[in-house]
């Protein structure tokens, strides 16, 4: 029996989401379009298999083939990131980070991470997160120019003496200097943990410096800029840390791994290792630069005055409207983005004075400089006349026509 016959409600809603993804423009920096091949294996019979443990050391029988699959995923991950050890079992980036903390430090130990309101992530010590409840957290941020001041990070580290320093961000448009972070970590005797979830796809293509050999441990998601399935990974070059990480993930915080997702990670890594991937990642940055240039030419303020990666962070501190207003206006025109706090923030986190835009998903659809210039100017048009609902509707129809030339999926399920 087909899904349409068995559960028409879910079938119809899934197809409505397909329509939304195809007709609209996805510019949330952390979202992307994965491969049909990735979705195909995620919907396979591998979902039926329990495989607690690791290849060759399972608690269940019948794991000979999933052992081969997980080993393949591990080897591809190691090759991709040029590291010696990899754990591909984390179900998400947050669980990967949780596993790193459990492996490297003890509850109550101090961690130094990037302030959430400055571009960090919940799992980097935010008080509302378990990382801020189980561990004592302190923070560094960006200056009013939107950039990390590494000397200030050093001062904070010397004062706070953390056991672990987290470098990585969810809304930072500039290159992260992993070597400087390692210098600081060594000065205070801390582990350096790099969370590259948002830039991993650029890192493996050589479009952003690698955290290796500087970081003791590296984590990432496998979706976002990597375009794989939703999941997490942890990597290191230290054998003893690798053993601790493995124990922290299983049996520490997870039971049976999701073998259908691990297989999908392996498929994604194969794509990431191809020459085609390097072309894609380069275009992501090129498109982000086009977006930057148009918005700055149109007199919009960008945090750090530009970008080095896949995202642009707009600041509306000098405007009467908020990040929430901008988010809603673009949404009315079929452009999905997200409101974001900015340096010098004056509004609440639910309103904000900023907007985060990213180019990975549009690039995955085949958008290049010409299309990005069109889209960027439409964004500026909307924000220059933010209450003009007729303009928003007109642009929505124009963008729907543009999107129809770049259909990413012909069907909702694989």
From Swiss-Prot:
HAMAP family in the cross-refs: SHMT
Matching InterPro entries: PyrdxlP-dep_Trfase, PyrdxlP-dep_Trfase_major, PyrdxlP-dep_Trfase_small, Ser_HO-MeTrfase, Ser_HO-MeTrfase-like, Ser_HO-MeTrfase_PLP_BS, SHMT-like_dom
Coiled coil: none
Involved pathway(s): One-carbon metabolism; tetrahydrofolate interconversion; Amino-acid biosynthesis; glycine biosynthesis; glycine from L-serine: step 1/1
Cofactor requirement: pyridoxal 5'-phosphate
Function in brief: Catalyzes the reversible interconversion of serine and glycine with tetrahydrofolate (THF) serving as the one-carbon carrier. This reaction serves as the major source of one-carbon groups required for the biosynthesis of purines, thymidylate, methionine, and other important biomolecules. Also exhibits THF-independent aldolase activity toward beta-hydroxyamino acids, producing glycine and aldehydes, via a retro-aldol mechanism.
Its EC number(s): 2.1.2.1
Assembly with partners or alone: Homodimer.
Keyword Cell wall biogenesis/degradation attached: no
Protein name: Serine hydroxymethyltransferase
Organism: Campylobacter jejuni subsp. doylei (strain ATCC BAA-1458 / RM4099 / 269.97)
Chain positions of site Plays an important role in substrate specificity: 223
Domain of life: Bacteria
Underlying gene: glyA
Keywords carried by this UniProt record: Amino-acid biosynthesis, Cytoplasm, One-carbon metabolism, Pyridoxal phosphate, Transferase
Principal location listed in the UniProt entry: cytoplasm
SUPFAM superfamilies for this protein: PLP-dependent transferases
């Amino acid at each position: 029996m087909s899904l349409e016959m068995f559960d028409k409600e879910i079938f119809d809603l899934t197809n409505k989401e397909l329509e939304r993804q195809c007709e609209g423009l996805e510019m949330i920096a952390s979202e992307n379009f994965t491969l049909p091949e990735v979705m195909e294996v995620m919907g396979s019979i591998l979902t039926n298999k329990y495989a607690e443990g690791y290849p060759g050391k399972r608690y269940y029988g019948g794991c000979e083939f999933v052992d081969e699959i997980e080993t393949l995923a591990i080897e591809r991950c190691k090759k991709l990131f040029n590291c010696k050890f990899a754990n591909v079992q984390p179900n998400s980036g947050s669980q990967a980070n949780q596993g790193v903390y459990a492996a490297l430090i003890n509850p109550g130990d101090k961690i130094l991470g990037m302030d959430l309101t400055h571009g960090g992530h919940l799992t980097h010590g935010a008080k509302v997160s378990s990382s801020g409840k189980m561990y004592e957290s302190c923070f560094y941020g960006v200056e009013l120019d939107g950039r990390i001041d590494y000397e200030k990070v050093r001062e904070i580290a010397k004062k706070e003496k953390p056991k672990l320093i987290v470098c990585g961000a969810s809304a930072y448009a500039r290159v992260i200097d992993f070597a400087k972070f390692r210098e600081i970590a060594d000065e205070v005797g801390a582990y350096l943990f790099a969370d590259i979830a948002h830039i991993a796809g650029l890192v493996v293509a050589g479009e952003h410096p690698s955290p290796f050999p500087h970081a003791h441990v590296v984590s990432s998601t496998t979706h976002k800029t990597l375009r794989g399935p939703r999941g997490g990974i942890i990597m290191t070059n230290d054998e003893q840390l690798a053993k601790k990480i493995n124990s922290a993930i299983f049996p520490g915080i997870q039971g049976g791994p999701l073998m259908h997702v691990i297989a999908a990670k392996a498929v994604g890594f194969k794509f990431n290792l191809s020459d085609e991937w390097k072309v894609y990642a380069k275009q992501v940055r090129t498109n982000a630069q086009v977006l930057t240039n148009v918005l700055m030419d149109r007199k919009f303020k960008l945090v750090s005055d530009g970008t080095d990666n896949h995202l642009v962070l707009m600041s509306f501190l000098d405007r009467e409207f908020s990040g929430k207003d901008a988010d809603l206006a673009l949404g009315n025109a079929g452009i999905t983005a997200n409101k974001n706090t900015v340096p010098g923030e004056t509004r609440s986190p639910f309103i904000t004075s900023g907007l985060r835009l990213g180019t990975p998903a549009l690039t995955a659809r085949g958008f290049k400089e010409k299309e990005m210039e069109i889209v960027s100017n439409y964004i500026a048009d909307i924000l220059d006349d933010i209450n003009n609902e007729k303009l928003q509707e007109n642009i929505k129809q124009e963008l729907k026509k543009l999107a129809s030339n770049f259909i990413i999926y012909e069907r909702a399920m694989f």
